[in-house]
């Protein structure tokens, strides 16, 4: 069964808009600041996730669609948090190093256990030469609790959503994100006992969450890059890309364009 839902068309339409309007400007930037670089990497991760969702055209992929939609939502929250969390870029970079250190320490610990495999020189050197500096910086950023930090902001996802203080995002987190998590985590929840007719709805819910999150990302990137200052109709074209799949025929499309001032 092919997904013919309007949300799949929306996602494709928004990606086309992105490729024409936002992506070229992003890729044309030079000498990025640390926060700009973090924003760019996060934005590119969103793009690749969207590309994957667009390729998954069958309802049988409802679990993968849900997992990817969940990731896009989390990345969209990250982009918003970068605007408000102090030392965001430093925290993101340090957390990346901290995660690497955690993996290295686990490998070294395992290598010292019975039947453990020896670690490479790269791993042992990382543990020997970078551990002190990484943990010292982590202590500065998160205090003594740094070992329990699971996200660069220091907040769990629910807390991150609360930090943003956006009613729409809070609503989506409570009513949509959780159901996507059911398709991600082990257990019976999410699909057990459901009729076959439920799975297209699950796939469409995932696409809907992805559309909401991707639209938020594009709006943020337009604002951050200041594109609206040079092109007063860019938000109108974004709204067109979002709503065009709702139209039925050329007459409705022309009416929509007219209502948006295009």
Per-region residue spans from a language model:
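Short capping loops/turns at secondary-structure boundaries
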Residues: 58, 65, 93-97, 169, ...
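Short, glycine/acidic-rich hinge or "gate" loops at secondary-structure transitions
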Residues: 65-67, 84-93, 227-236
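Internal, hydrophobic cores of structured domains that mediate oligomerization or house catalytic pockets
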Residues: 69-110
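Short, Φ-rich (hydrophobic/aromatic) sequence segments
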Residues: 42, 92-93, 205-210
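Long, hydrophobic/aromatic-enriched structural stretches that serve as scaffold segments
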Residues: 17-82
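Secondary-shell segments that build the walls of catalytic and ion/ligand-binding clefts
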Residues: 1-34, 99-262
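Alpha-helical solenoid scaffolds that mediate protein-protein interactions
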Residues: 46, 53, 65, 72, ...
């Amino acid at each position: 069964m092919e997904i013919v839902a309007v949300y799949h068309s929306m996602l494709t339409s928004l990606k086309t808009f992105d490729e024409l309007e936002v992506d070229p400007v992003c890729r044309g930037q030079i000498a990025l600041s640390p926060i700009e670089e973090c924003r760019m990497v996060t934005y590119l991760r969103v793009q690749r996730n969207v590309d994957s969702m667009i390729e998954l055209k069958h309802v049988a992929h409802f679990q993968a669609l849900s997992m990817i939609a969940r990731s896009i939502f989390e990345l969209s929250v990250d982009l918003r948090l970068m605007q408000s969390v102090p030392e965001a870029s430093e925290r993101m970079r340090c957390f990346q190093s901290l995660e690497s250190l955690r993996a290295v320490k686990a490998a070294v610990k395992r290598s010292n256990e019975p039947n453990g495999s020896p670690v490479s020189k790269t791993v042992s050197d990382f543990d020997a030469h970078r551990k002190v500096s990484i943990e010292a910086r982590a202590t500065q950023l998160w205090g003594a609790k740094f070992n329990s930090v699971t996200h660069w902001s220091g907040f769990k996802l629910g807390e991150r959503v609360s930090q943003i203080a956006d009613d729409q995002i809070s609503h989506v987190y409570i009513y949509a994100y959780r159901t996507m998590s059911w398709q991600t985590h082990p257990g019976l929840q999410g699909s057990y006992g459901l009729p076959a007719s439920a799975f297209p709805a699950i796939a469409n819910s995932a696409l809907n969450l992805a559309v909401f999150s991707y639209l938020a990302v594009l709006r943020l990137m337009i604002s951050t890059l200041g594109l609206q200052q040079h092109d007063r109709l860019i938000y109108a074209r974004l709204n067109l890309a979002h709503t065009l799949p709702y139209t039925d025929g050329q007459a409705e499309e022309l009416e929509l364009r007219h209502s948006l001032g295009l």
